[in-house]
A protein has these predicted regions:
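Conserved N-terminal structural module of periplasmic/extracytoplasmic solute-binding proteins
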Residues: 23-26, 30-106, 110-115, 156, ...
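Extracytoplasmic/periplasmic substrate-binding proteins
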Residues: 588, 593-678, 700, 704
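C-terminal capping/gating helix-and-loop segments adjacent to ligand/active sites or protein-protein/ligand interfaces
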Residues: 726-805
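Hinge/lid segment of periplasmic solute-binding proteins
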Residues: 459-514, 526-532, 642-648
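Helix-loop-helix "hinge/cap" segment bordering the ligand-binding cleft or interdomain interface
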Residues: 109, 190-192, 196, 498-604, ...
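Short, solvent-exposed loop/beta-turn-alpha elements that line the ligand-binding surface or hinge
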Residues: 475-488, 566-587, 646-657, 790
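Periplasmic-binding protein-like
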Residues: 542, 681-711
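Extracytoplasmic "Venus flytrap"/periplasmic binding protein-like
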Residues: 419-489, 498, 612-620, 636-637
Length: 813
């Protein structure tokens, strides 16, 4: 893992109005003047509603590969049984047969739902080279070699007049593995699959004749109304003329965005202009160079052609936005979530816009039993008055958790009475202020505009809201629930979230933020204070560091404060304790870390934290336990000598803290608290809990996951009997493998009882929750900077921090 990725992980650990359809929003965003362009997220109204209609695929279609919309028709590729059979001999010597499949193109009528195969499409190219597809040649030993071919359509795109473009690759190979010719083609088909023209990608023209096996990849194909074709492979944009000839290309430093289309006549890339604003930069085939630049939203990394109302569309945070032609304002056009559609199930390359305003997408959903299905979704605008209204409950968040988004969709679809309407304040972030949305939310709450529910991703000041009396105690709801009583939940994470015995937020899942050390170094300490850490460090060779050498003062300060927040702040009584020996000791602990890591002078090869621990170069590894797979890997990587000692704390308590992907709150002003609890309790359903990546908060799901993780499967023969190794022992089956950095791949097997007991001991001993109030962290970082730079004493810094945080607390009352 690189330092930048590692730093990102550190930050993540730390910072750890509609009817039944989508609404049409007001126009109050981007300024048309590029110099004054802003990107505040739009508010929504219920002037229009979009209603989803799903179409199931025909039974013989196993999987949609790639798709596009040309005109008002959806085209897609799929693998279907072709009536053939193949056989192979398995490891036991038994002959096994299976059906063969062919790749087919379908045309889907979005008005009738009729799905038609393009019978005129020829699935393989005509190959004259006998060494190529389905050819025959002589091997070096004089034997005859028969080459078979495999053709795959990698991507497709709309063309002019209802046609479609495909990029397909055909590879040939002999039974002995000898590689034949590889053929790449851009082909244009009419609505029935008849071949109109073929273009050979420019890479093939320059292919090394001694290397006949080539794999060309094209991510994007676009065409304009003059017949020019544009391709993009993440490195180069190539442009071809109406006659198929190569025109020009752009690559390297000239490309810093995504190939996309603004209109039928304008193809180009999204890029940053000289003044740092986002623009659409047109490719001009006539001049063979860049053409005009059009200002676009700073959130529009990939755009789609507009219609009679909008200049272009783009997606952001699970919604579709558009820039209005009449005002130049960017507004939210469709909120997938408000349409009861989970945007997690839709790929950006598998949806499009029809001329009549409908939106079409291919959806993918998986189930907990391992099954999956695809459907075709059509969103049609409807009169809002015709939609049966429900009680709407506003849920505020700052970035919506992936799994929670799916659960909201499920709840909204199934509930006859309630609808959760999400307002994601991360949409208000600007290039200059990432936390602008949090500021807006706090301002609205202070002014009395309080949401019904809050979903916290460890970045919102929940304890502050609770101290203001804005949040409901959730224990009475749990105690009164007929199914989810306290003893049905993992109580330790909940108890750590309590304030004076009240539970103001309920986590949907949990993990444990901790620091790992080797038992041979960190065992034997009754406490784990800063002095204990320094004592343990003295046991290691000279030059060893407490944590990874890349961590800076700023990173470690935020880490330590977030892990120790409950030791220094009490929102309920409005006090803080930064002018203390304990906090000064924390500052002194942070000071030896570098202000900035000197990458230029570092010539050493990267070593993972696990390697540094085992080599005596590092005392502790900050990480989080999220699942039993994490647990198994940690023990295996450290030769079963892992100890979860956590971060140093001066009060003698454990240095571990719980975290969660999302915690849920009900506000005291909620318009329907029974409905709000109905939604929260839906996140406790066993199917949802068992699908989470983190540890479930539902005890039965946690225990079921533990049982599954501790159950070892073994290799068996066709009769179900265990296969034994040379020593007469059954052969365990790995559930997968994990590798970090320079560490070798470690196969994952069943968690042992000892490992299970270790994680339970960590959970049972943890008493705090990672608490991040970004405003407090900013104050501490600002005032600690002088001490860390040597211009202030630790006493001066702690007094300034105490004064400013105290004032901040009083201001928030």
């Amino acid at each position: 893992m690189t330092k930048r990725m590692l730093s990102l992980c550190l930050v993540l650990v730390l910072l750890l109005g509609v009817l039944a359809g989508c609404s049409k929003p007001e126009t109050k965003t981007d300024d048309k003047d590029p110099a004054a362009q802003t990107d505040a997220a739009p508010e929504t109204t219920s002037q229009y509603a979009y209603q989803p209609q799903y179409y199931d695929l025909p039974e013989d279609i196993q999987w949609i590969g790639t798709s596009c919309i040309s005109g008002d028709t959806l085209y897609f590729t799929a693998s279907v049984p072709d009536g053939g059979k193949e056989t192979y001999t398995d490891e036991t010597g038994a002959e096994v047969s299976y059906d063969t499949y062919s790749e087919v193109i379908f045309r889907f009528d979005l008005d009738t739902g009729e799905c038609v195969k393009l019978d005129n499409y020829v699935a393989e190219p005509v190959v004259e080279d006998p060494n190529g597809a389905n050819g025959v040649t002589m091997g070096q030993d004089g034997s005859m070699q028969v080459f078979n071919s495999s053709t795959n359509i990698q991507t497709m795109a709309p063309g002019a007049d209802g046609t479609i473009w495909l990029f397909r690759q055909t590879n040939s190979y002999a039974d002995d593995g000898t590689e034949g010719t590889s053929i790449s083609e851009l082909i244009q088909l009419d609505a029935h699959g008849t071949l109109l023209r073929t273009i050979t990608p420019t890479e093939e023209e320059d292919a090394d004749e001694t290397d006949s096996w080539r794999y060309t990849y094209i991510d994007t194909i676009l065409s304009d109304d003059k017949g020019y074709v544009y391709t993009y492979d993440y490195q180069t944009v190539n442009v071809y003329g109406p006659d198929g000839s190569f025109v020009f290309s752009k690559s390297g430093d000239e490309l810093n965005g995504q190939l996309c289309q603004l209109s039928e006549s304008e193809v180009g890339i999204t890029a940053s202009s000289a003044d740092g604003k986002m623009v659409f930069r047109q490719l001009d085939p006539e001049t063979k160079d860049w053409g005009k630049e059009t200002p676009i939203s700073s959130r529009a990394w990939n755009i789609y052609p507009g219609n009679d109302v909008y200049t272009y569309f783009f997606t952001n945070n699970g919604s579709i936005f558009g820039e209005r032609k009449d005002t130049g304002a960017v507004e939210k056009v469709v909120d997938w979530l408000a349409c009861d559609v989970d945007s997690n199930t839709i790929s950006n390359d598998q949806f499009g816009f029809l001329s009549d305003g409908r939106i079409v997408a291919v959806t993918y959903e998986s189930s907990n039993d391992g099954g999956s299905r695809q459907q075709i979704l059509v969103l049609a605008r409807a009169d809002a008055d015709s939609v049966q209204p429900k009680t709407e409950l506003a849920l505020a968040c700052f970035g919506l958790d992936y799994n929670l988004r799916s659960q909201i969709v499920k709840f909204n679809r199934s509930s006859a009475d309630y609808r959760i309407v999400v307002k994601d304040y991360s949409e208000y972030a600007t290039d200059d202020d990432y936390n602008a949305g949090l500021t807006k939310l706090n301002t609205e709450i202070i002014s009395g505009s309080v949401p019904d529910l809050i979903a916290n991703n460890m970045q919102m000041p929940i304890r502050q809201y609770a101290a203001k009396g804005l949040l409901e105690d959730l224990w009475p709801y749990i105690d009164a629930d007929p199914e989810y009583s306290r003893d049905k939940l993992m109580t330790k994470p909940l108890e750590s979230l309590q304030t004076d015995g009240k539970l103001y937020q309920l986590p949907i899942d949990f993990g444990v933020t901790t620091a790992i050390g080797l038992g041979k170094v960190v065992d034997g300490y009754d406490t784990w204070t800063l002095a204990d850490v320094n004592d343990a460090l003295s046991k290691l060779p000279e030059g060893a560091t407490v944590f990874n050498k890349y961590y800076t003062q700023a990173e470690m300060l935020q880490y330590c404060v977030a892990m120790n927040a409950d030791s220094f702040m009490n929102w309920q009584d409005g006090t803080c304790n930064f002018d203390s020996d304990e906090f000064r000791a924390l500052l002194e602990f942070v000071k030896p870390f570098p202000a900035e890591y000197d990458w230029q002078s570092d010539s050493e090869e990267y070593e993972s934290d696990y390697s540094r621990l085992k080599n005596g170069k590092q005392l502790l590894y900050p990480t989080s336990l999220y699942s039993f797979n994490d647990l198994y890997y940690t023990f295996a990587a450290l030769n079963n000598d892992a100890r979860f000692v956590g971060f140093p704390r001066e009060d003698g308590s454990t240095g571990n803290a719980f975290n969660s992907d999302a915690t849920l709150c009900i506000t005291t002003t909620c318009r329907d608290k029974a409905g709000a609890w109905a939604f929260i309790r839906s996140t406790l359903e066993e199917d949802f809990q068992k699908s989470l990546w983190n540890f479930p908060i539902l005890k039965s799901a946690f225990e079921a996951n533990a049982k599954e993780a501790m159950t070892q499967e073994y290799e068996t023969d066709a009769d179900g009997n265990q296969i034994l190794d040379e020593n007469g022992n059954p052969i365990p089956i790995s559930t997968g493998g994990i590798s970090y950095g320079d560490e070798p791949m470690i196969e994952l097997y069943a968690v042992t009882q000892e490992q299970y007991d270790a994680v339970m001991a960590v959970i049972d001993s943890t008493t705090s929750f990672v608490d991040d109030d970004q405003n407090v962290l900013n104050i501490i970082s600002d005032e600690a900077a002088g001490y860390l730079a040597g211009s202030k004493t630790v006493e001066e810094a702690s007094k300034l921090i105490q004064s400013r945080v105290s004032l901040y607390i009083q201001e928030q009352k």
